[in-house]
A protein has these predicted regions:
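Glycine-rich, charge-decorated loop segments at or immediately adjacent to ligand/cofactor-binding or catalytic sites
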Residues: 125-138
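Short, charged, surface-exposed secondary-structure boundary motifs
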Residues: 129, 151-156
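Short, conserved loop/helix-junction motifs that constitute active-site signature segments
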Residues: 82, 108-114
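Glycine-rich, N-terminal phosphate-binding loop of Rossmann-like dinucleotide-binding domains
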Residues: 92-93
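N-terminal beta1-alpha1-beta2 submodule of the flavodoxin-like/Rossmannoid cofactor-binding fold
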Residues: 1-87, 97-98, 104, 157-169
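Short, well-ordered alpha-helix to beta-strand connector turns
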Residues: 85-86, 114, 139
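Short beta-strand elements in bilobed, periplasmic/extracellular small-molecule ligand-binding domains
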Residues: 42-44, 139-148
């Protein structure tokens, strides 16, 4: 398998099990670090040209507005090509029940014919939401993994099991 890890992650003020906490590295990026350690796969971070606010409450309102508008936020960059990869591990936080709209910007930019997407979603209790069904509009999707963001630092064994169950490692 030749896979690329593509991810969207947000640092700054985040919600952790009922409380706000400032983090320098987002939960999804921490999970991606575990995947990279376990697989050695390359990764690509999706970053918006105009990022969401560092303030959590403002961020969720901005994300909600993007969802309502079906926006496709401009990204600083996209991978040059996905041709060398047969699989994409797509990691993201659950924003309003689906992927962040910046992830849709990525999905819209490529043809996923012949590729398989493995979704990994960080959240604080909302699970995968409808993200898997939304991604299926673009690509063949295998079993996704929902991780509670506040526990992701210790989730390497769970991630390893998911990778093994999907025959990624």
């Amino acid at each position: 398998m030749n896979a690329l890890i593509v991810f969207f992650s947000r640092a700054d003020e985040n919600y952790f099990g009922g409380a706000m906490k400032y983090v320098e590295v987002g939960n999804t990026e921490i999970a991606v670090g575990h995947i990279k350690e376990l697989t050695g796969f390359d990764s690509f971070k999706l970053e918006m040209t105009n990022p969401y606010s560092a303030d959590y409450m403002t961020c969720i309102e901005e994300a909600k507005a993007h969802l309502r508008e079906n926006a496709r936020p401009e990204l600083k960059a996209l991978p040059d090509s996905l041709d060398a990869y047969d699989s994409i591990i797509l990691a993201y936080p659950n924003y309003w029940g689906t992927v962040p709209m910046a992830v849709f910007t990525f999905l819209d930019a490529f043809d996923f014919s012949g590729k398989t997407v493995y979704p990994l979603c960080t959240n604080e209790g909302s699970g995968l939401g409808k993200s898997v069904s939304d991604i299926k509009k673009y690509a063949n999707v295998c079993e996704g993994l929902s991780l509670t963001g506040s526990t992701v630092a210790k989730a390497k064994p769970v991630i390893e099991k998911w990778l093994k169950n999907n025959h990624i490692i």
